[in-house]
Amino acid sequence: DFVFAQTWPDAVENLKLLDEYGCKPEIELFDLGDIKLLNQMIKNDKIRGPYWVQMITGGTGVAPVIESIQYAEHMLPENSLLSILGVGSGQTPLAAAALVMGHHVRTGMEDNVYYAKGKLAESNAQLVERIVRMANDIGRPLATPAQAREMMGLGAPRAYTFDGRTYGGEVHTLDEMVSDNS
């Protein structure tokens, strides 16, 4: 058993470092009361918009119901981009609701190892493909990496080095990086 504790000064320092390095923080809402903390950080000029907000549903804090999304819509500050993450059995229904409501979705085996009741997911790709299929079925366009960066107020990718090779200006997949360096 352990508790992950982050004090207000810790959070402020982390936000300062993220901003200094041109990174957009993901504000995770484990409880709807966390919106109050986000608003306090904005009021004290500790974070700049647009605000990338990830609402974790299905855990111990946020119920995996549409009303949770509606509450967040009402309470989040302007210039917020809301993404929904469903843990457990709420993942697929909440992802569908988020897409229909015009929000974003996070999926993957970090959050849910099941594809369906009693059926383990084969891969992250399988979970992502389901979200893509759902979005296509309702006519919801998917953002390209460049569009996502623009929505979040991020500039072009900076150059970085991985395993002795420098990348920059273009977005590379992890598969490309690994195959290029093997």
Regions found by a protein language model. Name each.
Residues 1-110, 120-126:
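Catalytic alpha/beta core domains of metabolic enzymes, predominantly
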Residues 36, 67-77, 93-182:
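Structured C-terminal cap/extension of enzyme domains
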